[in-house]
Amino acid sequence: MFLVWKKLRLSKFIFTGNMSLTLTDNQTFNQDGKFISALKIPHSTNTSGWGSLLLPVIIIRNGDGPSVLFTGGNHGDEYEGPIALRKLANELKTEDIQGQVIIVPYLNFPAILAGTRLSPVDGLNMNRSFPGDPDGSMTQKIADFVYRELVSRCDVVFDFHSGGNSMIFEPCTVLHKLEDSEQMKKTVLAAKSFSAPISLVLQELDNKGMLDTAVENAKKIFISTELGGGGFVSPRTLTIAENGIRNLLRHLEILPPDELLVPQTRFMQTPDFGGYLMAPQEGLYETLIELGESVTKGQVIGRIHSLTQIEDPAVEVRAQIDGVLVTRAGRAQVKIWDTIAVIATDLDVSDFETNSTD
């Protein structure tokens, strides 16, 4: 059914009961125009027995052309994506584009409402729930809908992240090394077009169930970001997000080109897991290095002060490789084995840009 919202042109509820989350038909995706839709998910609580959760989905289409899916709020304590995509949904007009733009500003809406990384409904991490399960919990059902109905329709998927409450990043796009040379080339060029200060080829600690992995396995182009963190949004990180969206849309020829010069990105990588530094004990972490600063192997980059053993000296945290500090703990209080720093090294991507199956 259709519902008119006063401030929005059109809203279409996509309803699910005891079945897969799905569109009632494909009309919204296949017709030109700007549609503000809502995925209606039954959500029974102690205070609302027959309640529902509405997940906004914005679809803008103008003729044939490339298609891109933008997602934010994969984790509920990361805010650059939701704000930038909310603004994009308001500002982008059908006549501005050639192709299709799909926007999901709050992918894990329950977590966004709670301000938590994980969903308060089922305790799951959205970014470890793909490709989803139509018969699973709310998070798994949303993941299934996004993968089956949205990812399948798009050429490129761009998923906004930041460090959340627990980490802070030097602003960067994130991509992965891929075996398919043509897919890798297109991914590198897309990251370059976004023009974040750093483009980080990241070796994930755990990639099972990630949206990244699901999209890459489908042989589509996937880019993510890590823009700041600490549970807040800065003018710098939001500007990077907003400018980057427009840059990417021009690169994909969804928006027309312009003559503006975009800043160059610095390609870096986590060459191995030696770039990840974990807290050897719990306590208060004193960082000695600013994000973006160079470090050398063996250099003391921080100290952990015990909260209980006052007479003990602070434990030094030393860099295991030469490189640049791209991530640090977002809070002073850390637990044992928390990731408290990530060090990256420069990467020459010229081979990725030139080697392809063309």
Task: Identify the role of each PLM range.
Residues 2-358:
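Structured catalytic-domain cores with a bias toward divalent-metal coordination
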